[in-house]
Design a protein with these regions (language model features):
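Active-site-proximal helix/loop segments of hydrolytic enzymes
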Residues: 2-154
Length: 154
């Protein structure tokens, strides 16, 4: 999962930088950074938004789809814009935008979301998620959602 997340995050980073964004990554290689370490990087960067990229897992072998999570209500517009952009691709089953007190969204003072880009525990979805085309589709949709969010607040 960590490698898939990094691949997708790097695609998002590249696309956002191509649009002129200043992007700070909490990790750029196959290294582990504690939750507190991620928080330190984020606070020092003082970002406009925070997006945490993940893949989901479940005990059910049939669980599938995309969902994202927020903590503070001011993060809902970001969550919904990204959710809608991913949904527009038709690439994954769409679950929902949900409130949940994940550490990274709870301690971040800017609009922040944690994305769950499919279930690696479901064989059919895993086979899709490991492809470059899937990572490209999800990264592009995430970027489009971020752009829509910023356009909506100007």
């Amino acid at each position: 999962e960590a490698q898939l997340n990094l691949i997708m995050a790097q695609k998002i980073e590249s696309k956002l930088k191509a649009l002129g964004a200043n992007v700070i990554m909490t990790r750029t290689g196959d290294t582990y950074l504690s939750l507190e370490g991620r928080n330190v990087v984020t606070r020092n960067a003082d970002p406009d938004i925070f997006v945490s990229v993940h893949r989901n897992s479940a005990t059910s072998s049939t669980a599938k789809g995309y969902e994202n999570f927020y903590f503070y209500p001011f993060s809902i517009p970001l969550a919904k814009n990204v959710f809608d952009s991913v949904g527009a691709t038709g690439h994954l089953t769409m679950r929902s935008v949900k409130y949940y007190p994940y550490y990274v969204t709870r301690v971040t003072e800017c609009p922040s979301i944690l994305t769950e880009n499919g279930f690696v525990s479901t064989a059919s979805e895993y086979e899709k998620l490991i492809t470059d085309a899937s990572n490209e589709t999800l990264a592009q949709a995430t970027v489009e959602g971020i752009v829509k969010y910023f356009n909506s607040i100007q």
